Amino acid sequence: MSSGGLLLLLGLLTLWEVLTPVSSKDRPKFCELPADIGPCEDFTGAFHYSPREHECIEFIYGGCEGNANNFNTLEGCESACAA
């Protein structure tokens, strides 16, 4: 294979690595936790990653405690957990 072909192959492999979504084995364990409303009653919208749905979804959060699978924004959830 010519050096140009090798360079093209290397570029394509690099692009594939960058564009490949996070796999479930690379996803943090807290993303597998269920949505947890917590014990408080300051109800507000939040997002959690749903392993069953394979996406971040909105839920009502009580405002305190809960667990680590709890994000203020959809973007934050997707950045941490979405595949």
UniProtKB/Swiss-Prot annotation:
Signal peptide range in chain numbering: 1-24
Compartments, as annotated in UniProt: Secreted
Tissue specificity comment: Expressed by the venom gland.
Residue span, BPTI/Kunitz inhibitor domain: 31-81
Cytoplasm in keyword set: no
Record InterPro entries: Kunitz_BPTI, Kunitz_BPTI_sf, Prtase_inh_Kunz-CS, TFPI/VKTCI-like
Pfam families to which the protein is assigned, alphabetical: Kunitz_BPTI
Gene Ontology MF annotations: serine-type endopeptidase inhibitor activity
Disulfide bonds: 31-81, 40-64, 56-77
PROSITE patterns: BPTI_KUNITZ_1 (PS00280), BPTI_KUNITZ_2 (PS50279)
Keyword Repeat: no
Keywords: Disulfide bond, Protease inhibitor, Secreted, Serine protease inhibitor, Signal
Gene3D superfamilies, alphabetized: Pancreatic trypsin inhibitor Kunitz domain
Cellular-component GO terms for this entry: extracellular region
Function per UniProt: Serine protease inhibitor.
Family named by the database record: Belongs to the venom Kunitz-type family.
PANTHER family assigned to the protein according to its UniProt record, in alphabetical order: KUNITZ-TYPE PROTEASE INHIBITOR-RELATED (PTHR10083)
UniProt-recorded name of the protein: Kunitz-type serine protease inhibitor microlepidin-4
Organism of provenance: Oxyuranus microlepidotus (Inland taipan)
